[in-house]
Amino acid sequence: MKRALGLALAAALVAGGCLGLRVESRAPTDPDAPGQWQSRTTMTWGRQEVAVAALGGKVYVMGGFSSTREPVDIVEVYDPATDVWRAVAPLPIPIHHAAAAVVDGRLFVVGGYTGGRLQWTTLGTVFEYEPTQNTWRGRAQMPTPRGGLAVAALGGRLYALGGAADRAMNTHEVYDVAADRWSSVNPMPTARDHLAAVGFEGRVWALGGRESFLGTQYANVEIYDPATDSWRTGTPLASARGGLAAAALGDKIFVFGGEAPLRIWSATEMYDRTINTWVAKAPMPTARHGIGAAVVDGRIYVPGGGREPGFAAADVNEVFTP
């Protein structure tokens, strides 16, 4: 099922890009904070609002908006060992604001929008990539079509959180990969889109996000326990932001970039569970939003994104070593 995205929401989502501003946020950053960033070979096609995931030691960047502000079906794969990008089979349709995750060695792209020029259509599609055949196939559709959602992999399941159709949602649906079946579970306490999510130590963490482009930005951290179908509140981020990326590495969670109205972020934060606090790490060299993050061999890759509020697709490929 597809539903047309309201024109008012679409206009709000792109308003910042129409202003043509490039203003970095005053987010708390410390250039001397621990961690090291390195720039690697850029993507062939600059894109933002991308879906990003790691599979087989490589980084996949799927869909998004190009510099022409039109959605694309492009899929590029980055090999950190050779510092080379290559194109693989495109998505079945152009998609932006989708989310991606790998569950039990299988790569899925979930939801998003298709269409451009303010004529966005919400999607409930689920596509699985088969690397041995270099093909995509459709799977059981998500019950609630939405874009700007986040997904997290945990225990053989994919958790789809939040997003928006005509407004921000607190919808929470779970995909059982083996059964190819969706179910609804306890919704998030806070309705939001453009959030990030990770599976971490048996829980699903929902991080940041926003009510709308010009509305409330959230620092909220909400933690879901699948065993009890319950939520609890975690320590909030140091700064409220939507359009951020997140990754779990070892016993830490990292968040990167994002935007607030008319501002973009370079801030990197790390959750240290030993002190139950988010601490500043070295900021991204290039402030961006509409990004994703993927972990390969102890490093976190953050490709693409927008350099300005709204539209400003970048081909940047930066890697963080904690």
For each feature predicted by the language model, list its residue ranges.
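Bacterial N-terminal signal peptides that target proteins for export
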Residues: M1-A8
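Bacterial N-terminal signal peptides
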Residues: A8-G16
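Kelch-like beta-propeller repeat domains
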Residues: L19-P322
